Amino acid sequence: MMMANVINNPPTPFVHNMGPIHPGKMIFINGIPGANPSRFNINFEDTPDGPNTAFTCDFRFNFGYDRNVIVRNSMQNNNWGAEERAVSYFPMAPNAYFEMIILVEQLGFKVAVNNNHLLEYKHILLPLDKFTFLRIDGDVRITQVRFQ
């Protein structure tokens, strides 16, 4: 059963049954990365600890060899696909408030941060409606999540 449309100050990790994703669905995520963050990620999964992830968006501030990188990927049956890393800028900073919008479209996801288009990620795993869980994990304090 789908829960509330607005969730304020949820704990991290945050796992929520948002109902099926579909073209036109928008997810608004506001938050603040930690003071010395390693990474945080946003995932659309088929179950709370899903073996299938339609989309992961992993903001890596200082993780392994990665510095200020955004990794996008999909996972099928616990196997990750090919990473996408190219973006024109890294919109996050430690302790800096952000507002993110993720729009589900027919062909893929579009992500904007602080009113600026950031990236697109084409759908790899279908059908979309089997992905009902949003997971946010890592070095971030979420102030609000909203679904529309």
Q: Where do the PLM segments sit?
A:
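C-terminal helix/juxtamembrane-tail motif
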Residues: 1-14, 133-148
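Eukaryotic short linear interaction motifs
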Residues: 36-38, 49-52, 108-110, 118-121, ...
